[in-house]
Amino acid sequence: MFERSDAQRMLTIKKWSYPLFWAIMLPLLPLTALIGREAGTQDYWAWGLYFVVFGIIPILDYIIGKDPSNPDEITEVPSLNEERIYRIFTLLMVPIWFGALFWAGWVFVNNDYSWFGMLGWIVSIGTVGGIIAINLAHELIHKDSRLETWAGGLLLSSVTYAGFKVEHVRGHHVHVSTPDDASSSRYNQSVYHFLPRAFVRNFINAWRLEKQYLERKGKKNISIHNELIWWYGISAALAVVFGLLFGWMGVVFFLGQSFFAAFALEVINYIEHYGLHRRELDNGKYERVTPAHSWNSNYLLTNIALFQLQRHSDHHAYAKRRYQVLRHYEESPQLPGGYAAMYVLALVPPLWKKVMNPRVEAYYQGEMDQLFRAGKRVNNIA
């Protein structure tokens, strides 16, 4: 049994583990670049951080274990919400990320990589971008503070994925776990079937949602009031700056890391709602979102790395809750690993289905006829 004193101790550990994790992880970038250059094996070391995230962290997750603790709603949550350190840290990561991104662009054009090393460096930086830029933006864009939502938009612009700011809040959170949501994967759907549709539909839907929003405000779509024009404009400006600083290869680097950051995000989206559905009601609408409509994971290390994104059930039930007070729901469907491990598994569809399909079927015993697959109910499953 997890005692209250253990929960309080875990809150203290996590409070300082968020900055400590990144104080350890970010220096690995210059370390791998330096070791590779000195040893003449820079092409292999370029993949170093990618290997750490998806090779070492899953192992450490299983060694360190899970964190089932929740802050007390009466005695702890109010004070946790008021502690500025949590907010300050997320905002400080914005200039840190931009500094790391420009430094990484310099390394890309000066480290004498072969095509293999270039790809490895782009993938490694894109992975960091997926965690810092997109994941932190995800935390920030849900907040009421204009500073935080703008910081989130700026982070998304750094990976050319500004549509997420609009579509995620106004689209995904409204239609999650229904056929109307491109970011909710279907039962038995592979990640490679899911990704192209997610990229295209979410991009189109972001512009459609922004247009509808502006029309309700009585403003023109193609105007200075359209925030997507501003955020994508910043992305274009960043691409130009990378080109001026580092030549055309700088632009290749900027766009490449953007793609792999967005790729990482959508793979995580695939994992978070795989096979889950909201029941259709008699009036044709869907039941309200609850913690039952997202996969939960309590592996401590990955939760620290991702600002408790893995407590996704609580996030969807209460989208404005800050990361430090997100809760674990034992009754939510539980992933067998942390996101880092599940990411690797998702890239191998036969293994993914072997592990996850039985879990979906067990969770929905007696309701398999309600499942959705690529927008259609799966009626041929017993």
Kindly label every feature range from the protein language model.
Residues 67-70, 107-110, 141, 275, ...:
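Juxtamembrane transmembrane-helix termini
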Residues 71-86, 208-215, 318:
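Short membrane-interface loop/juxtamembrane segments of multi-pass integral membrane proteins
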